[in-house]
Regions:
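Conserved beta-strand hairpin/beta-sheet module of binuclear metal-dependent hydrolase folds
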Residues: 1-48, 120-134
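Active-site HxH/HxHxD metal-binding segment of metal-dependent hydrolases
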Residues: 14, 28, 35-110, 192, ...
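Core dinuclear metal-dependent hydrolase active-site scaffold
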Residues: 21, 97-123, 159
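Divalent metal-coordination and catalytic microenvironments
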Residues: 22, 32, 57, 69, ...
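Active-site metal-binding loops of divalent metal-dependent hydrolases
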Residues: 33-35, 58, 82-83, 115-116, ...
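A short acidic, helix-capping loop that chelates divalent metal ions and anchors anionic groups
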Residues: 85-87, 137-143, 176
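Active-site-adjacent loop/tail segments of enzyme domains
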Residues: 138-164
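Accessory terminal helices/loops
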Residues: 155-165, 174-254
Length: 254
């Protein structure tokens, strides 16, 4: 059976969330549906049938729509093993494979603690759906994990192929770039990205997806060993963890 090309579209929710819709013009997957209403509307408009739900972590803005979706569609929900959920789900963790045959797509689960302790991401040959771990030009706040855990998680993502498309779940790119420029005011890649993102947002388009290559050149949380960042962070020790911890704190108050 020939598979239709996979299409990936953001469904905007709340103030700045993206619920990711993956479909082949017939069947669909949603990732982190914090709100059911826009998902149901999109499925109806596009004449799609929901076939699976993927969850990266337990925060309400990522799972709030699951119960309502399950009332309309009896589908599997894949969610982190190390977190609790108020709905039936298939618990998955590090190294497990989710085989979505109707999309000719396989996701490997990565356990990436930091934002929450059980946070997972879904990675394929071409795509990374990383919830609130890696943001476009930023990273998630440390609600449950330690700086060391988050840094280790981000360092794992740095090793993915450079052309991997990065799909996170918040439209934070503009402010993240502005913060990054306080640490690397001479980084031309950041200025170029700021201009590109400003135009996208002006046109009411998402700034996502990013790529691992783009993040490596513009995301300060993946660049803690850069001399400019070390200098502007004003740390007494220049090791990667100390720098990461400081700039995460600076971003919290930016």
């Amino acid at each position: 059976m020939q598979h239709q090309p996979l299409q990936i579209e953001p469904i905007p929710a709340f103030e700045d969330n993206y619920i990711w819709l993956l479909h082949n013009t017939r069947d669909a997957i949603v990732i982190d549906p914090g709100d059911a209403a826009p998902v149901l509307a999109s499925l109806k408009t596009k004449k799609l049938t929901l076939s699976a739900i993927l969850i990266t972590h337990h925060h309400a803005d990522h799972i709030g729509g699951v119960a309502s979706l399950l009332e309309s569609y009896s589908v599997p929900v894949y969610a982190p093993s190390y977190e609790q959920f108020p709905f039936n789900h298939i618990a998955v963790t590090e190294g497990e494979i989710i085989d979505l045959t109707q999309f000719d797509l396989k996701f490997q689960v990565m356990w990436l603690p930091g934002h929450t302790l059980g946070h997972i991401a879904f990675v394929s040959e071409a795509y990374l759906f990383c919830g609130d771990v890696l943001f476009s030009a930023g990273c998630g706040r440390l609600f449950e994990g330690t700086p060391a855990q988050m840094l280790a998680s981000l360092n794992r993502l740095k090793k993915l192929p450079a052309d991997t498309q990065v799909y996170c779940t918040h439209e934070y790119t503009g402010k993240n770039i502005d913060f990054a420029l306080t640490l690397e005011p001479e980084n031309q890649a950041l200025f170029d990205r700021k201009q590109a993102v400003s135009q996208l947002r002006k046109d009411n388009k998402p700034s996502l997806p990013s790529t691992i290559a783009l993040e490596l050149s513009t995301n300060p949380f993946l660049r803690c060993n850069q001399s400019s960042i070390i200098r502007h962070a004003e740390v007494t020790e220049a090791d990667e963890l100390t720098v990461f911890t400081k700039i995460r704190l600076l971003r919290n108050h930016y």
